[in-house]
Amino acid sequence: MIKQALISVSDKTGIVDFAKSLSDLGVKLLSTGGTAKLLADAGLPVTEVADYTGFPEMLDGRVKTLHPKVHGGILARRDLPEHMQALEQHGIPTIDLLVVNLYPFVATIAKDDCTLADAIENIDIGGPTMLRSAAKNHRDVTVVVDPADYAVVLDEMKANGNTVGYPTNFRLATKVFAHTAQYDGAITNYLTSLTDELKHASRSAYPATLNLAFDKVQDLRYGENPHQSAAFYRDLAAPAGALANYRQLQGKELSYNNIADSDAAWECVKTFDAPACVIIKHANPCGVAVGNDSADAYAKAFQTDPTSAFGGIIAFNREVDEAAAQAVAKQFVEVLIAPSFSDAAKQVFAAKQNVRLLEIALGDGHNAFDLKRVGGGLLVQSLDSKNVQPHELRVVTKRHPTPKEMDDLLFAWRVAKYVKSNAIVFCGNGMTLGVGAGQMSRVDSARIASIKAQNAGLTLTGSAVASDAFFPFRDGLDVVVAAGATCVIQPGGSMRDDEVIAAADEHNIAMILTGVRHFRH
């Protein structure tokens, strides 16, 4: 039964109302510093911890709750007579509810002007110590680190005579240990990232010790293949607009492959300003287009490769309206992603309950790192978020691209970034015409892209081509020109650049070098 609570919070969201409800239930309130003042100013009966322990706060508040009367009251096991006798002997009442959240360390170090001294002063000591004590003794103590749990605790207390059951206490305790682990991980990441701990001149993006924190969203039926087990975890710092923040409106449970392909589709479609549609199969775009609206963009994207689009993942960067929904509903689709769906669109898919509809808010945020597991280790890199600017483009051929060709080239370049290497992408009029992906030789990717367009009945005459990396020989260029391309965009940087540029001049096509490579493995 909860008779006494200790409350000490940095995030004061909802704390006055929560404390008032506790007081109304007859719970005695202990508190510290600013929290105690806030509660007292609200007219609540609260005892300062310094008055409770008989020992004042000291060292600029660094020592407030590190006292046997606090930790003894938290850690004592109520089922052990010797523990309770020790409390009685020393005049220590039990503390049955602990409400604590920590100094805002992560928010502090995120500030551009944060110094090492600022960071150090925002490393909480007393808070984590109390939290861990209470979480360890969760059989007897309820511990709350998240304001979102205030209502849960109150409801259970009201229903059970000021008692919170073991299942809730256990869940809250696990939440505490996860929270303190993440807190310590953030401190370690910060301190081991300092390149000059004395002057605090700068920080490395890659700390000597890397701690990552994820919460499980769900267990998955299986992994990439049925014999593999799997689960999906969300980054605790997932940015706005990230796939992990999806809201599923209908459909079957997402699979491992659904999630992986949906991420590829969403990351690609977000890069376009005009209404766009991206169709993904096995993490590769098989159709990308921009149009007047979602329906128009879909029609053009689907036209690229109708065969591969079967059972694909489709993403839009605009609301899916009834017209777009009716067009998509004619095909077999696994997942449909958009910032929103109109009511009429939802009605269209109501008859197709197996189709998974995901809503994700558009956002500019990106993950801090791109991670890839290798045997016994982890490769960590910054995201490939580089977008070339017009002044960075270099025309290296005698013929310059026309304005229309330039538009097609930039569109093709944007798509190629999301195609598995080696990547060759034919485009024209705001749509992909042929995509060659994942081949060991660039010339084979060029041939496949040409064949794909031919199979779809699309002409490549006058098309633009993007290559994610340089042409090592002129053979790949010869293939795309023979297919009908009149302009090419590529990074350059090959030992044979002069030979490839000479071939472009020989064919009287325009070639642009970006100086940026977009390998994707």
UniProtKB/Swiss-Prot annotation:
SUPFAM superfamilies: Cytidine deaminase-like (SSF53927), Methylglyoxal synthase-like (SSF52335)
Superkingdom, natural source: Bacteria
Reaction(s) this enzyme catalyzes, per UniProt: (6R)-10-formyltetrahydrofolate + 5-amino-1-(5-phospho-beta-D-ribosyl)imidazole-4-carboxamide = 5-formamido-1-(5-phospho-D-ribosyl)imidazole-4-carboxamide + (6S)-5,6,7,8-tetrahydrofolate; IMP + H2O = 5-formamido-1-(5-phospho-D-ribosyl)imidazole-4-carboxamide
Enzyme Commission number(s): 2.1.2.3, 3.5.4.10
A Pfam entry, by short name: AICARFT_IMPCHas
GO MF assignments: IMP cyclohydrolase activity; phosphoribosylaminoimidazolecarboxamide formyltransferase activity
Residues in MGS-like domain copies: 1-145
One Gene Ontology CC term in the entry: cytosol
GO BP terms, alphabetized: 'de novo' IMP biosynthetic process
UniProt key word rRNA-binding: no
Functional pathway: Purine metabolism; IMP biosynthesis via de novo pathway; 5-formamido-1-(5-phospho-D-ribosyl)imidazole-4-carboxamide from 5-amino-1-(5-phospho-D-ribosyl)imidazole-4-carboxamide (10-formyl THF route): step 1/1; Purine metabolism; IMP biosynthesis via de novo pathway; IMP from 5-formamido-1-(5-phospho-D-ribosyl)imidazole-4-carboxamide: step 1/1
UniProt keyword terms in alphabetical order: Hydrolase, Multifunctional enzyme, Purine biosynthesis, Transferase
Keyword Magnesium recorded: no
HAMAP family linked to this entry: PurH
Record's comment describing the protein's domains: The IMP cyclohydrolase activity resides in the N-terminal region.
Family listed: Belongs to the PurH family.
Name recorded for this polypeptide: Bifunctional purine biosynthesis protein PurH
Gene that this polypeptide is encoded by: purH
